[in-house]
Amino acid sequence: MRLKTLATHPVWREPRTVFGVWMLTGVIFAIVKLLIGKYNNYKIFEGVYWHAIEGLTLYGDHYPEYYDSNHYGVLFSLIIAPFALLPEWLGMILWIAGNTALLFYAISRLPLSSTPKIIIYWYSYCELMTAQGVQQFNISVAAFILLSFVLILEKKDFWAAGIIMLGTFIKIYPIVGLAFFFFSRQKVRLLVSCLFWGLVCFVIPVLYTPGIEYVISQYIDWFERLKVKNMLNMFADRSEEH
């Protein structure tokens, strides 16, 4: 009876409670993975930054630094940079926490009342834990898609385009945000903004990597790597996908 009372307590319907549970789970997963030494995805992620500034291929074999291959675009090196520059244990904890907080914020922005949002928070919690456990960036990918939808509804197409292009240049999948084109009341502005932000996202890595030739070569290698990945996906363990 006490367990039932606890499970139905109003505190679980408070957004701050959900946020606390989400963040606590992320920190616990990070600490456990650090202690047992199983955080290969994060090693790949931080490696993207160091390899980019050193002008090394982002998609080759970097064993024993880590196993498996990177599947993220050159721009990802900028996103992971603040975490890669920190001590590994701190960077990984903040990485998981940051991704988690972004998804929580994105859901909070949906044009829904409190109750549906709480349902979404708890319904997605199990999948969130899986992603936290393997340090996936997919948490933020989901956030990008949600935020692009919200911003388009709010007639902030310029910023929606920025999020769509940022996500696309990092991991392709957020390009599905363009499906929200039909919800836009500023369609031309959205398309022009996508072109602008696409150019910005392409140029930014040139500023801190060896140069434009390196960036172009890495984008070519990235597309080739994605082709291989797509062929293998049907046989892959999706829980380990990064």
PLM region descriptions:
Residues 2-159, 184-241:
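Primarily membrane-embedded glycan-assembly and transfer machineries that use lipid-linked glycans
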Residues 158-182:
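Membrane-interface alpha helices of multi-pass inner-membrane proteins
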